[in-house]
Amino acid sequence: MIAVNQYFDGKVASLGLSNSFGKFTIGVMAAGEYEFNTSSGEIMTLVSGKWFIQLPGSTDYMPYPEGSSFEVAANESFKLKVLEDCGYLCQYK
C-alpha cells in the first residue's frame, strides 16, 4: 500500500512504498528550512532542485547537487536549506 505523508504544514510531502527495492519515499519540498529526525538509517538523493545539508555533528551547510546523495544514521537529526522547490528520493536502511 502507498502511504501519503505531509510535514511542515504541507511544505514537505511524500509517497511511501515498500517493494523489492526496499522501503523508500519519493517526495517534494518547498523552498525553506527544515530539520528531520531519523528513526532508521536514511539515504537521501536530490532528484531535482537545490539544497544545502547540515549533517549530524557539523555546524556547516554543504551543497549537494542534483543526483548526489547523503546518508544519515538512525536516531540522528539533520537540517536542510532548500533554495528552490525540489524533488527527492529517501531510501530507508
Can you say where each PLM-predicted feature lies in the sequence?
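A generic structural motif
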Residues: 54-56, 81
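Ligand-binding loop in jelly-roll beta-barrel domains
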Residues: 73-93
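Short, conserved beta-strand element in jelly-roll/cupin
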Residues: 39-53
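Conserved short histidine dyad/triad with adjacent acidic residue
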Residues: 10-11, 19-39, 66, 71-74
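Extreme N-terminal tail/first-helix region
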Residues: 1-16
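Short hydrophobic/aromatic-rich beta-strand segments that constitute the beta-sheet cores
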Residues: 36, 53, 89-90
